[in-house]
């Protein structure tokens, strides 16, 4: 199992293939992505690489992290993430990871944070149909209805679908296909959409599940 990389979402575009079919693409940029540290089975109980991206002012780094970056002999990074790996896939500290870490036609898993929607009602948040528009219903047309039962159990059960904060959740989209890799522009073109707003950071790693070909 190889390490993944941290990339930045640039935006979306579309291209046409040989059959005239339109393919939606998400562009992600891989720039200044380096190995910051190692996690070993003997010391930490598992094998992993710590990957960092985007330089950070030294004045904004805590003293413990200053020592970490000093030991790695690299500039401080803004974003850090661990990737579990197998023992044979360790990479030297301070090694840079580029877009050629992946190839066109490969399937990857994308982990990102969804766009925050703020406080949302039940219809937007959970796709409820709402109450009737007339026939005695007033004020509560977009309400979610009853939230509980009676004196017994006398409470609202945990997990009840109600209005609340929507978005800002970490999600993983599996088995997205890489359409092309542009080494000059440091871009990876991925088929389909990816969670998150423009310029947000996400992780790209090899697909963990095999793709079955349907004939």
UniProtKB/Swiss-Prot annotation:
Origin: domain of life: Bacteria
Annotated positions of the N5-methylglutamine modification: 151
Keywords: Methylation, Ribonucleoprotein, Ribosomal protein, RNA-binding, rRNA-binding
Name used for this protein in its record: Large ribosomal subunit protein uL3
Gene name for this UniProt entry: rplC
Function: One of the primary rRNA binding proteins, it binds directly near the 3'-end of the 23S rRNA, where it nucleates assembly of the 50S subunit.
Post-translational modification: Methylated by PrmB.
Subunit structure: Part of the 50S ribosomal subunit. Forms a cluster with proteins L14 and L19.
Family the entry assigns: Belongs to the universal ribosomal protein uL3 family.
GO cellular component, one term: ribonucleoprotein complex
Biological process per Gene Ontology, one example term: translation
HAMAP family: Ribosomal_uL3_B
Residue pairs linked by disulfide bridges in the UniProt entry: none
Lineage: Bacteria, Pseudomonadati, Pseudomonadota, Alphaproteobacteria, Rickettsiales
UniProt-recorded Gene Ontology molecular function terms: rRNA binding; structural constituent of ribosome
One Pfam family, short name: Ribosomal_L3
């Amino acid at each position: 199992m190889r390490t993944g990389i941290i990339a930045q979402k640039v935006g979306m575009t579309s291209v046409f293939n040989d059959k005239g079919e339109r393919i939606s693409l998400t562009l992600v940029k891989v720039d200044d992505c380096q190995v910051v540290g190692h996690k070993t089975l003997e010391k930490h109980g598992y094998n992993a690489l710590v990957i960092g991206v985007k330089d950070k002012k030294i004045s904004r780094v805590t003293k413990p992290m200053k020592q970490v970056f000093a030991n790695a002999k690299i500039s401080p990074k803004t974003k850090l993430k661990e990737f579990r790996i197998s023992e044979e896939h360790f990479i030297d500290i301070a090694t840079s990871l580029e877009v050629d870490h992946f190839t066109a036609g490969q399937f990857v898993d994308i982990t990102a944070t969804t766009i925050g929607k703020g406080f949302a009602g039940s219809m937007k948040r959970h796709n409820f149909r709402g109450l009737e528009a007339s026939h005695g219903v007033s004020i509560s047309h977009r309400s979610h209805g009853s939230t509980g039962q009676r004196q017994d159990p006398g409470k609202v059960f945990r997990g009840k679908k109600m209005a609340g904060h929507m978005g800002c959740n970490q999600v993983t989209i599996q088995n997205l296909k890489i359409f092309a890799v542009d080494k000059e522009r440091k871009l990876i073109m991925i088929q389909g959409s990816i969670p998150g707003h423009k310029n947000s950071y996400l992780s790209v790693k090899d697909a963990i599940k095999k793709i079955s070909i349907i004939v």
